[in-house]
Amino acid sequence: MLDGTRVNLSELLGQVVVLQFTASWCSVCIQEMPHLEKEVWLPFKDEGLMLIGIDRDEPLEVVKKFKKQTGITYPLALDPGAKHFSKFAHKNAGVTRNVVIDKKGNIAFLTRLFEKDEFEAMKQKIKLLLKE
């Protein structure tokens, strides 16, 4: 995380987790982030949801500035060398993607890019998972 703490997904078992892969230079990510803030993070953060933006391969100061510029309140984490990103996509693939993980730690939904219908489907899946 930006404050230097480390988070393991195993520590988040029992919560619905959304990993949002992002970068300050990714225009699609920047377009999606306000929607994640308003439509996912703010309504569900107190209902068992953890949303973590994972910034791909950028230095800490760049990511801090990026967080401030976007105005998001959900936590951002660093991904040096795109180590975590490469578990879900080829390192040279486009950045924008969300990985929704259920309370048991299983991947329940994946998105690519920012497309309205897919985003709505992701929100509905999150709502269902939170009720389980």
Where are these regions (language model features)?
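Hydrophobic beta-strand anchors of alpha/beta hydrolase catalytic cores
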Residues: 18-19, 51
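A short beta-strand-turn-helix
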Residues: 1-17, 88
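Active-site acidic short loop of glycosyltransferases
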Residues: 12-15, 46, 73
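Active-site-proximal beta-strand/loop segments in catalytic clefts of secreted hydrolases
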Residues: 21-23, 54-57, 79-80, 111-112
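Conserved redox-active cysteine motifs that mediate thiol-disulfide chemistry
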Residues: 13, 21-38
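Thiol/disulfide oxidoreductase modules built on the thioredoxin-like
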Residues: 68-73, 79-127
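Structural microenvironment flanking redox-active thiols in thiol-disulfide oxidoreductases
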Residues: 30-70, 81-87
